[in-house]
Every structure is written in C-alpha cells, then in structure tokens.
Amino acid sequence: MTREGGATVTVFVPYDCKNHCPFCINKQEYQNPEGFSVEKVCESIRMFHEITPKCDFVFTGGEPFSEPDALQVMMDCIPEGHRVFINTTLPVSDLFPAERIIAFTERNKDKITCINISRHMVHYVEECNDELLGSLKVPVRINCVLFKNYPHDGMIAFANRFAKYGLPIQFRADYTITTPENLYEREGDRSSPIL
C-alpha cells in the first residue's frame, strides 16, 4: 500500500538476472538495454522525488542483488523519507556471499522497508539457504507464484519451511497468461480454490 500523497515507482535495475523463470514478465525489457544505466536510474529517482516526494520505490528486474555495488549506488540516490522495497530471488554468489548480503541489509536497514524474496514450489533458480533469510536486518516477505502444475499437496510443508523464521508468505497466481478477457474466469484456474 502506498502512503497518502505518494505513488509507487517501479525501478527496473539496469542489468539482467540471467535467470529464466518461466513466469517472468520482464525478460523482454532486457533484450535491448541501450540507454539503460545506473546513472539513468539515479536521474529518474531524483526526478520522481521532485514530482512526488512521498513515493515508494520498488527495485525489481532483473535481479537487484546480482550487481551489489550498482544496487548500493541506486539506494544512495534515494533521499530520506521514501519507503524502499526490493524484489529478489536473493542469489548468493562469490560476488555477493551471505556475509555481504547481511552487511548490505545492516547498512541499509533505515532505508529498506521490506525485501520480497521469491521462493517457489518448484525450483527455478539457485536459492540461498533459508537460514540466511532469518539473518537479514530488514523485514522479509516470501513471494510464491503458483505456476502451472505446482504441487498442491506441498503447500503446508512449504509454508512451514518459512514459519520457523517468522516470515510471512504471499501466494499469488501466475499472471503470464492473464488478459482482460480471462481475468475473472475461474474454470481451469488451479490457484482459484486456494487464493
């Protein structure tokens, strides 16, 4: 929910995640990255701050954490007073090991409102270990897309997996085949009995 008088500004990070999640609706945005840079993103952040100084910023992609130094530059461009959300698969790599992720959240804990971490019933990307999620210094929420033939009978175990860390879970439907014409159709929608 956006604060009164504000707006939600979605910031597509200017680098591709190199993942291939089948439900991703942003991949085509990265086919032609011309004119897409950290500097341009910072210009846009400053412009939106001038237009709507109470706006929320949502970093998504791509994968915001795949280039941590660039993400920090963009975070530093956001003036105080804005809520900041990061949508991520939270990859752990040699470039961004667990200790560095924890340090990033510690350094930005007064700026980050919540990190929304994608976890799914079927694995599509390399995931960090669950213990790391409980060690982050900012609020965390798990986002789970109920994509195609996800295992219904595994939902309780999936929820329990994160319950021990006190992490809320948002289940959402797969939007990749949603059109204005079929938006309210429930027949054949495997997620409608659950959602």
Locate the predicted segments by residue.
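Core AdoMet radical
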Residues: 8, 26-36, 52-67, 80-97, ...
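Canonical Radical SAM [4Fe-4S] cluster-binding loop centered on the CxxxCxxC motif
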Residues: 1-43
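Radical SAM enzyme [4Fe-4S]-AdoMet core and its adjacent flexible, acidic
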Residues: 118-195
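Leucine-rich repeat
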Residues: 41, 71-72, 97-104
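N-terminal active-site wall of soluble small-molecule enzyme domains
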Residues: 69-79
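Aromatic/hydrophobic pocket-lining residues that form the small-molecule binding cavity
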Residues: 38-41, 70-71, 126-129, 155
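Class I S-adenosyl-L-methionine
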Residues: 1-5, 9-12, 36, 64-66, ...
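A short, N-terminal amphipathic alpha-helix
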Residues: 43-52
